[in-house]
Amino acid sequence: MACMPNLVSVDMDSCGVSNEDMAAIRDAYPDVKVIWRVWFGDAYSVRTDVERILASQPSHGGMLDRYNSEALKYCTDVKYLDVGHNDALDDISFVAYMPKLEVAILAMDNWSDATPLASCTELEYLEMQTTLCTDLSPLSGLKNLRHLNIAYIVDLEDISPLYSLTELERLWVGSNNRVPKEQIEQMRAAAPNCEVNDTVYDDPTGGRWRYVDYNDKAYIFILHPRYEKLREQFGYTSADFSFYWNDPLY
């Protein structure tokens, strides 16, 4: 590579080189786009230049944990990440390597440390409901955040770190926690244009988080515009999970 000064990219998909060695090559040539394939869980696989990862179906892709998800840190171009519903996932350190991350579904996992999220300054949408995270201070600098779900974190008792997020549009806190009502009102005052929900209980995505109405004649729910966009961003309607067999380049 040193003999090719005009080199722009290198594709080493499925070449058998370890992640560590590939990362060393990428670090040695920061002006070259170095791409390879990583595997995580039991059946998830993506190239390191992907912008979307959908890995929230452990029954088919395998349950993610801190060990078999570590390779996600090499996917530095990710904008849309869904690793929800992974009960064994107790560490999300890999998101610290995703500076372009805009949407993150980290809900119904077992992690408690949100520190890695502080590096994701482009985050616009974050679901972290039903986790063990009670320290929200790493979120205080995420000024681009507009939609945040922290409902059903039963030991949560302090949302004051969110007061700085004055441009929030929706904040789901729910009622199944220890957050004082005074803090709820302070949050509403800090972000006057934000819809703050402190009533949902056993369904953290209830209220207007996903659906805004129900059409009795057509028997269909009317999607919230942001949820409709979310479904498009992740390919939920086509079940476009990051299984290796769904990757046309594999």
Predicted regions located by residue number:
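Concave beta-strand-loop units of leucine-rich repeat
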Residues: M1-A23, D27-P138, N144-E185, A189-Y250
